[in-house]
């Protein structure tokens, strides 16, 4: 009953390495990168300022939206969720992800000016 946080984290990492498919690990690495980029932008905003506000806002919105799209892709590609997405093959999910990213970045570039 008295498991420490370190033991729980160690168990989680062992289980993640053993049971998570390689495709999901790549998506998780992408999500971690996007999360760290968003945190970096937010810290820069807090410490330095938001002088070109449109640039900051579009970059931060791009990070948040990219993270959401990545999570949606991970949900659709995960084999454990195949019953929820029975009519969507992984290739279609990836194509939807790419299309949504293109639209997102067109909107972001338009917002920058």
From Swiss-Prot:
Pfam families hit by this protein: DAD
Membrane topology: Multi-pass membrane protein
Major location category of this protein: endoplasmic reticulum
Record InterPro entries: DAD/Ost2
Expression induction or repression: Expression is significantly induced at 4 degrees Celsius and at 37 degrees Celsius compared to the control which was maintained at 25 degrees Celsius. There is a dramatic increase every 5 hours of each temperature treatment suggesting that over-expression is a cell response to inhibit programmed cell death by external temperature stimulus.
Residue numbers on the Cytoplasmic membrane side: 1-30, 74-92
Keyword Transmembrane helix: yes
Lineage top rank: taxon: Eukaryota
Transmembrane segments: 31-51, 53-73, 93-113
Pathway: Protein modification; protein glycosylation
Lumenal side: 52
Compartments it resides in: Endoplasmic reticulum membrane
Function comment: Subunit of the oligosaccharyl transferase (OST) complex that catalyzes the initial transfer of a defined glycan (Glc(3)Man(9)GlcNAc(2) in eukaryotes) from the lipid carrier dolichol-pyrophosphate to an asparagine residue within an Asn-X-Ser/Thr consensus motif in nascent polypeptide chains, the first step in protein N-glycosylation. N-glycosylation occurs cotranslationally and the complex associates with the Sec61 complex at the channel-forming translocon complex that mediates protein translocation across the endoplasmic reticulum (ER). All subunits are required for a maximal enzyme activity.
Xref: PANTHER family: DOLICHYL-DIPHOSPHOOLIGOSACCHARIDE--PROTEIN GLYCOSYLTRANSFERASE SUBUNIT DAD1
Assembly and binders: Component of the oligosaccharyltransferase (OST) complex.
Protein name: Dolichyl-diphosphooligosaccharide--protein glycosyltransferase subunit DAD1
Species this chain originates from: Araneus ventricosus
Lineage: Eukaryota, Metazoa, Ecdysozoa, Arthropoda, Chelicerata
């Amino acid at each position: 009953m008295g498991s420490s946080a370190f033991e729980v984290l160690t168990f989680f990492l062992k289980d993640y390495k053993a049971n998570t498919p390689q495709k999901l690990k790549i998506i998780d690495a992408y999500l971690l990168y996007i999360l760290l980029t968003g945190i970096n932008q937010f810290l820069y905003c807090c410490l330095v300022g938001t002088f070109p506000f449109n640039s900051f806002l579009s970059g931060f919105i791009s990070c948040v939206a990219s993270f959401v799209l990545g999570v949606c892709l991970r949900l659709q590609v995960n084999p454990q969720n195949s019953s929820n997405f029975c009519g969507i093959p992984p290739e279609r999910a990836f194509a939807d992800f790419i299309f949504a990213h293109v639209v997102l970045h067109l909107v972001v570039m338009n917002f920058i000016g």
